[in-house]
Curated annotation (Swiss-Prot):
Taxonomic lineage from the root: Bacteria, Bacillati, Bacillota, Bacilli, Lactobacillales
Pathway: Lipid metabolism; phospholipid metabolism
Catalysed reactions, as listed in the record: an acyl phosphate + sn-glycerol 3-phosphate = a 1-acyl-sn-glycero-3-phosphate + phosphate
Transmembrane region(s): 2-22, 52-74, 81-100, 112-132, 143-163, 164-184
Keywords: Cell membrane, Lipid biosynthesis, Lipid metabolism, Membrane, Phospholipid biosynthesis, Phospholipid metabolism, Transferase, Transmembrane, Transmembrane helix
Self-association state and partner proteins as the record states: Probably interacts with PlsX.
Organism per entry: Streptococcus pneumoniae (strain Hungary19A-6)
The protein's name in its UniProt record: Glycerol-3-phosphate acyltransferase
Primary gene name: plsY
Protein family membership: Belongs to the PlsY family.
GO biological process: phospholipid biosynthetic process
């Protein structure tokens, strides 16, 4: 019974639409009506500012981490922490508290990985910020980190680097999360190809995007 309760709790944690609620409560702004219409970290930064964007990221990240740690906190046996983390990501993407219309799963997925394999998460953070500096696009960085996650989980155990052994469930979860993130960014990918993707005011913009085009 406790397992079912905690699995439901993991989904509910993921379903907390932090950006949407922060906008409505503190700014009287519905993020769905502004910018990209997304309720995640990037649109929150763009529409509501740095403080709101950072708060959204922290909440979205650590709700994934907390969900992943639930079975450890409650000394639950028999169900991998990754299953709880996956449910949090599903909740974030399809939140019951926001009409099942959620974010793009990046921050919460990162939080899940941090809760299960923190050094692997650090590797992905380096990839993410490296890609962000080179391309000046959150979307490109997210997709790049997703691809790097798949490459890492498949190759690193072979060399005993960061991941000491192959974990079939971890590989499956990484493949699922990476696929979800890439699918959720399909519109962004199209804009990147057309050189019209939104930029952040940092980095080299080596792909020469022109969002005003």
């Amino acid at each position: 019974m406790i397992t079912i309760v905690l699995l439901i709790l993991a989904y509910l944690l993921g379903s907390i639409p932090s950006g949407l609620w922060i906008g409505q409560v503190f700014f009287q702004i519905n993020l769905r009506e502004h910018g990209s219409g997304n309720t995640g970290t990037t649109n929150t930064f763009r529409i509501l500012g740095k403080k709101a964007g950072m708060a959204t990221f922290v909440i979205d990240f650590f709700k994934g981490t907390l969900a992943t740690l639930l079975p450890i906190i409650f000394h639950l046996q028999g169900v991998s922490p990754l299953i709880f983390g996956l449910l949090a990501v599903i909740g974030h993407t399809f939140p019951i508290f926001a009409g099942f219309k959620g974010g793009k799963a990046v921050a919460t997925s990162a939080g899940v990985i941090f809760g299960f394999a923190p050094i692997f998460c650090l590797y992905l953070a380096i990839i993410f910020f490296g890609a962000l500096y080179l391309g000046s696009m959150i979307s490109l960085s997210s997709v790049t980190a997703s691809i790097a996650a798949v490459i890492g989980v498949l190759l690193f155990p072979l060399f005993g680097f960061i991941l000491s052994n192959y974990d079939s469930l971890f590989i499956t979860i990484i493949l699922a999360l990476a696929s979800l993130i890439i699918i959720r960014h399909k519109d962004n990918i199209a804009r990147i190809k057309n050189k019209t993707e939104n930029l952040v005011p940092w980095g080299l913009n080596l792909t020469h995007q022109d969002p005003k085009k």
